[in-house]
């Protein structure tokens, strides 16, 4: 029990240190992604919105148990990350290439695809023009 407890504390401390570093990177994140803030689209059921803060990345990763909140994903200059939701419940996280405007990945809980997976990808692809416009704004 002692080793498990120590490991849990170490993991928590590591996450807290990563989160502190991420907060320090918030300004750089805003410079990279600020032009996309407020970008959101829907098909009537699914709402896909840009993650607008480093904290949003952590919350998204923690809620869906995948890596978007780690490895400084928020500082990747050539991708944009969205949260796909239904009734404000997170369904999948979507990463879009800002080079070719194709979905690189879309992952639900524990990196699984959901029943809405294809629909989410189609929604993002259908709205690529809106995203592209923000790049030149």
Where do the PLM segments sit?
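Catalytic-core elements of nucleic-acid end-processing and repair enzymes
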Residues: 3-137
């Amino acid at each position: 029990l002692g080793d498990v407890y120590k490991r849990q504390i170490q993991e928590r401390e590591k996450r807290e240190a990563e989160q502190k570093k991420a907060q320090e990177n918030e300004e750089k994140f805003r410079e990279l992604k600020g032009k996309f803030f407020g970008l959101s689209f829907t098909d009537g059921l699914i709402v896909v919105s840009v993650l607008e803060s480093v904290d949003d990345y952590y919350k998204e990763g923690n809620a869906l148990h995948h890596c978007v909140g780690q490895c400084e994903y928020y500082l990747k200059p050539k991708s944009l990350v969205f949260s796909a939701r239904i009734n404000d419940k997170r369904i999948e996280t979507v990463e879009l290439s800002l080079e070719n405007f194709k979905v690189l990945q879309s992952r639900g809980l524990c990196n699984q695809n959901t029943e809405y997976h294809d629909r989410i990808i189609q929604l993002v692809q259908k709205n690529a023009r809106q995203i592209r416009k923000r790049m030149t704004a």
